[in-house]
A protein has these predicted regions:
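Helicase motor interdomain insertion/brace
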Residues: 1-242, 252, 270, 277-284, ...
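A generic short-segment signal for beta-strand/edge and adjacent turn/coil regions
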Residues: 177-180, 202-204, 260-264, 308, ...
Length: 423
């Protein structure tokens, strides 16, 4: 099923700014700090290195588009992070009086925004720990300054690199100033999700998984759904400090060796709505749920298949009997799996054109299914055959995600491992 929303209603002027930025000769950002070989004063002998730098820039542009579609919070956090990195790069490479003055003027002009960036950065990733009053208030962390590469002016056209980097900073500032006006109440995508969770006869009372590719989006949804009165919410991503096993068992106790009563006896609340990044999209048993929501547009059908596989798995007859005995109201939906894909039909062509502009790849995403091409999610599709297309798509699990998944497998095989590691 498709859950429709409007990008225009959510972003307003920001969508126009993004399209304008993508239509520049160097789409969105020039990013010379990641592609210095394009500004080499000497012939580039290592074509592989130059191509690698070029690909990095392309991937960053694609990532920004994906995060823009995901949520305003995900796009904002990326803009803030890149702003800080580019500022650090410009600061360490501005060695002439003219360059230092130009950068200082930019900082003074954007003083109000930079203060807001520091404040918002703390809010976006606040884990409930109070801010340290002694915390450095400089928007550029010391470690970023230390990590920024200092370019050899004999080899690279540093003045041109700095000029284009300042243009990138201006573009980021334009986005961030517009995002300062953003309020969750204008988020049409969020409103569509809240409506779905409150009005669908199954979703409003049974377990559901909500997947997003991005941590900032997942955390934003957890906060806003709770504000909207949705009960039984939990959220997990690659940086979650709580025990991942506990999070999984609280959402899917029956398929992870527990029951609702066992959770209650341990004074652990049972989760009804679990919001997760793709760290939970592979290798886990979450069949207590039979409904799944994919909050982001599907640029990668292979990862979509992995997500669906978390709830659409082989059922254990004994576990099913126990689950239905304890929760008779779920009997009608057991054995069926439904999933929703969020899709902006009115602006889909614009988003896909922007994607093609920076990736040179054409995606054909169905307006009725919300997925790419004709390779997935129709009754006649062959899920096993889809694996043959794996090499065509990006988005394999990150090293961190793979390590987390392997850790969970080890815990399942060796129940005492967690206690031994903590000892």
């Amino acid at each position: 099923k498709v859950a429709e929303y409007s990008v225009q209603k959510t972003y307003g002027k920001l969508l126009t700014l993004l399209e304008k930025a993508f239509n520049k000769k160097k789409p969105l950002f020039a990013l010379p700090m990641y592609y210095p070989l394009a500004y080499s004063k000497v012939p580039v002998a290592d074509g592989f290195a130059e191509n690698r730098q070029k690909q990095v820039v392309g991937l960053i542009r694609i990532l920004f588009l994906k995060r823009f579609e995901s949520s305003a919070r995900a796009f904002e956090s990326s803009c803030q992070q890149l702003l800080r990195k580019v500022m650090a790069f410009v600061q360490v490479n501005s060695t002439t009086k003219h360059e230092q003055t130009a950068f200082e003027r930019w900082r003074i002009h954007q003083e109000e925004l930079l203060g807001e960036v520091q404040k918002r950065q703390n809010q976006l990733f606040d884990d409930g720990v109070e801010d340290d009053p002694e915390q450095d208030e400089d928007v550029i962390p010391e470690e970023m300054l230390e990590a920024a590469a200092v370019l050899d002016r004999e080899l690279f056209d540093v003045p041109q690199i700095l000029s284009e980097s300042l243009q990138d900073l201006n573009q980021l500032a334009e986005f961030l100033n517009e995002l300062r006006q953003f309020k969750p109440s204008q988020d049409d995508k969020l409103r569509a999700l809240i409506k779905l969770l409150k009005t669908d006869p199954v979703l409003k009372k049974h377990k559901v998984m909500i997947f997003s590719e991005f941590m900032a989006t997942a955390r934003y949804l957890a906060v806003e759904l709770e504000k909207a009165g949705i009960k039984g919410i939990d959220q997990i991503d690659s940086a979650t400090k709580r025990s991942r096993s506990d999070v999984i068992r609280q959402f899917a106790p029956y398929y992870n060796g527990m029951t609702s009563k066992a959770l209650a006896d341990k004074d652990q609340p049972e989760t009804r709505v679990l919001i997760a990044t793709d760290v939970l999209s592979e290798g886990l048993n979450l069949q207590d749920a039979a409904r799944l929501i994919n909050y982001d547009l599907h640029w990668n059908p292979v990862r979509l298949m992995q997500r669906i596989g978390r709830v659409d798995r082989r059922m254990n007859p004994e576990t099913e009997k126990k689950l239905i005995k304890d929760h008779p109201d779920v009997k009608a939906i057991r054995g069926t799996v439904e999933y929703w894909n969020f899709l902006p039909p009115g602006e889909l062509d614009e988003l896909l054109n922007l994607y093609k502009r920076v990736s040179n790849k054409t995606l054909l995403i169905s307006r009725t299914l919300g997925i790419e091409g004709k390779k997935l999610l129709r009754p006649e599709d062959d899920f096993a055959a889809l694996k043959d297309f794996d090499h065509q798509y990006e988005g394999e699990p990150t090293v961190l995600e793979t390590m987390h998944l392997e850790y969970q497998r080890l815990l399942a095989a060796h129940p005492d491992l967690g206690a031994r590691l903590e000892a």
